[in-house]
C-alpha cells in the first residue's frame, strides 16, 4: 500500500 504524504515544504525545514 502506497501512502502519499503531504509536501515536506509545509514543514519547518531550517
UniProtKB/Swiss-Prot annotation:
Cellular compartments annotated: Plastid, Chloroplast thylakoid
GO CC, sorted alphabetically, is: chloroplast thylakoid
What other remark does the UniProt record contain for this protein?
On the 2D-gel the determined pI of this protein is: 6.0, its MW is: 18.3 kDa.
Query: What is this protein identified as?
Result: Unknown protein from spot 107 of 2D-PAGE of thylakoid
Keyword set, alphabetical order:
Chloroplast, Plastid, Thylakoid
Main localization is: plastid
